[in-house]
């Protein structure tokens, strides 16, 4: 039987976690990045399709390649983050379905409908980005997800000649709490949910 996690874990993962814009000068190791993926990969996706592909940018050279794609409001926070993850989706994710979903011919569901393939890849890679954020929080890291960037520039700079397309960016590191804004409100249950 499943058991609820502790109140402390809920605080770490949700209620006390914040989106960070400033970072401490504490590096994030490659081993930690591997740990993050080892956790996030278990999050569910449609037919186990797992379309997300992630580039972890850790070097000054990588950040300079990314710089022209960033909006002005996201520039400094990204250049100073220890890691920036480009969460992309593989437009031909279905080629891995014989391995990932061997129960039937799931590949044909998507090869016969390019629109379904694109919708599935984008939706599920977005879900996987959320799993990455939760994995970061679980390992004591902070994040700053962003959609304010030039996707075409990122695709040209990092994914030219491939089947990958960028979805969003996530800055990862140890946040500087002195640079946090006041916590913004969230919608109440009554405002966001319905019961039928």
From Swiss-Prot:
It is an enzyme of class 1 (oxidoreductase). The keyword Cell division does not apply. One of its GO terms (biological process) is nitrogen utilization. Its EC number is 1.1.1.298. Keywords: Flavoprotein, FMN, NAD, NADP, Oxidoreductase. It catalyses: 3-hydroxypropanoate + NADP(+) = 3-oxopropanoate + NADPH + H(+). SUPFAM superfamilies: FMN-dependent nitroreductase-like. One of its GO terms (molecular function) is 3-hydroxypropionate dehydrogenase (NADP+) activity. Its cofactor is FMN. It comes from the Bacteria. Induction: Up-regulated by the nitrogen regulatory protein C (NtrC also called GlnG) and repressed by RutR. Belongs to the nitroreductase family. HadB/RutE subfamily. May reduce toxic product malonic semialdehyde to 3-hydroxypropionic acid, which is excreted. This is Probable malonic semialdehyde reductase RutE. It comes from Escherichia coli O157:H7. The lineage of its organism: Bacteria, Pseudomonadati, Pseudomonadota, Gammaproteobacteria, Enterobacterales.
């Amino acid at each position: 039987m499943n058991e609820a996690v502790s109140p402390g874990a809920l605080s770490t993962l949700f209620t006390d976690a914040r989106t960070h814009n400033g970072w401490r000068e504490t590096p994030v190791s490659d081993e930690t990045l591997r740990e993050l993926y080892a956790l996030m990969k278990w999050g569910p996706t449609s037919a186990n399709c797992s379309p997300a592909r992630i580039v972890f940018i850790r070097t000054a050279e990588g950040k300079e390649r990314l710089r022209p794609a960033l909006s002005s409001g996201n520039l400094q926070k990204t250049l100073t983050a220890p890691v920036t993850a480009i969460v992309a989706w593989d437009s031909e994710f279905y080629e891995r379905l014989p391995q990932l979903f061997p129960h039937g011919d799931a590949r044909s569901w998507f090869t016969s409908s390019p629109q379904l393939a694109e919708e599935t890849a984008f939706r599920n890679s977005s879900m996987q980005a959320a799993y990455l954020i939760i994995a970061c929080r679980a390992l004591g890291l902070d994040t700053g997800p962003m959609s304010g960037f030039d996707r075409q520039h990122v695709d040209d700079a990092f994914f030219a000649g491939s089947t990958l397309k960028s979805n969003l960016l996530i800055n990862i590191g140890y946040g500087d709490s002195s640079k946090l804004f006041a916590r913004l409100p969230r919608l109440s249950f009554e405002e966001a949910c319905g019961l039928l």
